[in-house]
UniProtKB/Swiss-Prot annotation:
Lineage of the species this protein comes from: Eukaryota, Viridiplantae, Streptophyta, Embryophyta, Tracheophyta
Subcellular location: Mitochondrion inner membrane
Gene Ontology biological process terms from the UniProt entry: mitochondrial coenzyme A transmembrane transport
Protein name: Mitochondrial carrier protein CoAc1
Transmembrane regions: 22-42, 85-105, 130-147, 199-219, 237-257, 297-317
Topological type in the membrane: Multi-pass membrane protein
Positions annotated as Solcar repeat: 27-113, 124-224, 231-324
GO CC annotations on file: mitochondrial inner membrane
Described purpose of this protein according to its UniProt entry: Required for the accumulation of coenzyme A in the mitochondrial matrix.
Protein family: Belongs to the mitochondrial carrier (TC 2.A.29) family.
Length: 340
């Protein structure tokens, strides 16, 4: 029996060594992709109910226009049950995994490139994080935007479960979608591949400063922390949360324009009521004129509630996954150059 236990232990040890050696063979950028994807999935799922309510408020969905956060959550529970909290989350996670993976990985890559090629002219301070974060945000958005469009259209639908009649929040003209694939097929039929990127303008205009500011503020705040507390998870989370809150406040109106552009159907664009968003700045002015300036900040308080845990979970998971996968410290990566 002893020999059997020893054999089992030896086999387990050998398997662990094989797994460890396999991880060692992965390039650093692949490990950063894995860590970033895991961070995005955990963070997005944790705040999915709040994200659903935020979209309903941003798009002025009928029945939710005058409700607060708790009232909206209760209404979703009443008509759709717990599944209503996560409607569109499949598309959201499907988008956020490649988005977060690309965002974190390209941020590290852009940062390394800037330091290796432009450090003499722009220095090595937080401005590097501003530039790298902005470039990474734009790259990730362009690669994953159709999935964000699908997520928004699915979350915009509110079903009146168990009752007849139109779905809550959707007029008779609104298209009903049965999943991510159905969204892609329907939107593509409406206007081709270009329709899959409806609203990408305000998204890019918003993400470039937001992503840059988030990394800039996060790294700048971390640099102010005394050396004895540099490894404190709580302080890292606090820095990340503050960075996220500040960046969100500055760029939130652009997010509202993006959401309203995304839920516009071909029918609504051809309507005679005059409300049709054609571009970012025209959309800002149109919303102010027709819906009031407060609509540009609809759901912002909810976003504050959402951003704090989302950023906290995202940064924490990313750091934990990097440690688990054996990603070397940033300074070592830059020094070696070739690892990247």
């Amino acid at each position: 029996m002893s020999s059997s236990q020893e054999s089992t232990f030896t086999s387990a040890s050998a398997a662990a060594q094989v797994n460890a050696s396999a991880l060692d063979l992965l390039p650093v950028y692949a490990k950063e992709l894995i860590a970033g994807g895991a961070a995005g999935a955990f963070a997005k799922t944790a705040v999915a109910p709040l994200e659903r309510v935020k979209i309903l408020l941003q798009t002025r969905t009928e029945g939710f226009q005058s409700l607060g956060i708790l009232q909206s959550l209760r209404k979703l529970w009443q008509y759709e049950g717990i599944r209503g909290f996560y409607k569109g989350n499949g598309a959201s996670v499907l988008r956020i995994v490649p988005y977060a993976a690309l965002h974190y990985m390209t941020y590290e890559q852009y940062r390394c490139w800037i330091l290796n090629n432009s450090a003499s002219s722009i220095g090595t301070g937080p401005v590097v994080d501003l530039l790298a974060g902005s470039a990474a945000g734009g790259t990730a958005v362009l690669c994953t935007y159709p999935l964000d469009l699908a997520r928004t259209k699915l979350a915009y639908q509110v079903s009146n479960v168990g009752q007849t009649g139109n779905a809550l929040g959707n007029s008779g003209q609104q298209q009903t979608y049965n999943g991510i694939k159905d969204v892609f097929k329907t939107v593509y039929k409406e206007g081709g591949a270009r329709s899959l990127y409806r609203g990408v303008g305000p998204t890019l205009i918003g993400i470039l400063p937001y992503a840059g500011l988030k990394f800039y503020i996060y790294e700048d705040l971390k640099s102010q922390v005394p050396d004895d507390y540099k490894d404190s998870v709580i302080l890292k989370l606090s820095c990340g949360a503050l960075a996220g809150l500040f960046g969100q406040t500055l760029t939130y109106p652009l997010d509202v324009v993006r959401r309203q552009m995304q839920v516009q159907s071909k029918q609504s664009q051809n309507s005679s009521d005059g409300f049709r968003i054609r571009g970012t700045f025209q959309g800002l002015l149109l919303i102010i004129r027709c819906q009031g300036w407060r609509q540009l900040f609809a759901g912002l308080s909810l976003n504050y509630v959402k951003v704090v845990p989302s950023v906290a979970i995202g940064f924490t998971t990313y750091d934990m996954m990097k440690a688990l996968l054996g990603v070397p410290p940033r300074e070592r990566v830059h020094a070696s150059g070739g690892n990247k």
